[in-house]
Amino acid sequence: MAPPLLLLLLASGAAACPLPCVCQNLSESLSTLCAHRGLLFVPPNVDRRTVELRLADNFIQALGPPDFRNMTGLVDLTLSRNAITRIGARAFGDLESLRSLHLDGNRLVELGTGSLRGPVNLQHLILSGNQLGRIAPGAFDDFLESLEDLDLSYNNLRQVPWAGIGAMPALHTLNLDHNLIDALPPGAFAQLGQLSRLDLTSNRLATLAPDPLFSRGRDAEASPAPLVLSFSGNPLHCNCELLWLRRLARPDDLETCASPPGLAGRYFWAVPEGEFSCEPPLIARHTQRLWVLEGQRATLRCRALGDPAPTMHWVGPDDRLVGNSSRARAFPNGTLEIGVTGAGDAGGYTCIATNPAGEATARVELRVLALPHGGNSSAEGGRPGPSDIAASARTAAEGEGTLESEPAVQVTEVTATSGLVSWGPGRPADPVWMFQIQYNSSEDETLIYRIVPASSHHFLLKHLVPGADYDLCLLALSPAAGPSDLTATRLLGCAHFSTLPASPLCHALQAHVLGGTLTVAVGGVLVAALLVFTVALLVRGRGAGNGRLPLKLSHVQSQTNGGPSPTPKAHPPRSPPPRPQRSCSLDLGDAGCYGYARRLGGAWARRSHSVHGGLLGAGCRGVGGSAERLEESVV
């Protein structure tokens, strides 16, 4: 039975090696070599007892759980320089013995939380040369305790899972070079006691936060685990924030300063420590005082200068820090936005700008004006609805005499969509901050507010509804009697007016004027072009047919033996045939409906004159004066 069993084992071993691969069985470990074989996927018949699997330089595009199922003894997996764009969740779930994973030179864009789950004993992870833009925070959680080498170089990373990297106590080498990292969190490497090489070359780091890790590279002999640190190729901003790094005195590095302008291009370690300075914040401009109506949006602005750029904060009237909430939002540029203001938002706000060199403050006053509704806003009672504005005015006039003997409010020059509101100056002794116009229409019961400066005594209402009835009231907003009182309002007068109905012709023109005018313009251009082409052909054909110019004979006499011939009678020059009469249309300038058509027609007529002036001639003469416009078309 022994010889047949041996043959069976040999046959099974030979069948386990994929056809394009080479299998080597060295000292009880099986190696499957499938590099440079043009594979489009992981061979399904790889021996599950394989210890080393090399699949580099192929065309594999995706990895999934079936590819490495039951390969519990696999130690080294090489997938370099393929076309891998996706790694399925738990694709390496059965590789509990894996020590080295090479995924460099692929096309990975992101790593999810489950992409690298499974290899709990992984020590070397190479992900360089991909297109990684995002790595999930928990992508490295399964091998935090065992990982020794992590290579994330030559990717598009702006952020890396710093919390996971900082929890790798056995990490020796960390390569983050040639990425887009612009900031390092403070203390990111504080727990990496075994780290011996950190490469941050060619990123976007302008500053580095102090970290005890960097001081280990200053004295290689005294440090138990000396650090090789590289951060050249970064746009370092050489100010007081990097003074701690300058004091490390690392003469073997070749870093240079990118800013400020006075230090740009200078060797980092040659700049004296005294030139690593900062500038305290300075409030350049800010909102000094802002008045808003209750319910409106309030935007407080504050801009500060300094080196480094100051951090902006706001303190509210209650001496509390204003943070982001459902009602307010503080932006990093110093803008504070309150979405819907209320009476409790009024008061003094303080803008604070801070940086390592100091701080600066500025005060902004916010006043919230309560919405007036026909009387003094300090009076208690329910707010009138939007449809009873005129009733509120009449009640105030009859009951308390709020409507004083001041010039009445008038609405004149009423059209279908506009009306001019005017009122008198009132009594000089009454201080007025501003005027408020309230109006609504029979088509829409919504009450509309308009704020007018105190220096104005007329206001043009626009965008009214044609053929609608309007009720309008004018109120004067005056300063309150005391600091705790609300704004006082005084009703000046009310008016009722109706807008003109919309003209049917205007609606028709609004619907069709653009298309009709463009059609006429395009047709005119085509007709003019055809006329030019026809005249050119006629002139060329006539010149080619005659060959030479005819001779003109005028008063010619021949000398013969006979008597002189009678002098030919001079014939008057033949008048040219009459030109065909052009059709002219005269626009007298109706501003209501024909304004847009007249402008388009005039523009087309001027273009026709400039391009085909030889055909159109002098055109038609209008009779309406200089203010009238003429549209001309060639028929």
Curated annotation (Swiss-Prot):
Q: Where is the LRRCT domain?
A: 234-280
> Which intervals carry biased composition (Pro residues)?
565-580
Query: Which residues, renumbered to this chain, carry the PTM Phosphoserine?
Result: 585, 626
Q: Which residues lie on this side of the membrane: Cytoplasmic?
A: 540-635
Q: Where are the LRR repeats?
A: 49-70, 73-94, 97-118, 121-142, 146-161, 170-191, 194-215
Residues on the Extracellular side?
17-518
Question: Which residues are in the Ig-like domain?
Answer: 281-367
Q: What is this protein called?
A: Leucine-rich repeat and fibronectin type-III domain-containing protein 4
Q: Which organism is it from?
A: Homo sapiens
Q: What gene does the UniProt entry assign to this protein?
A: LRFN4
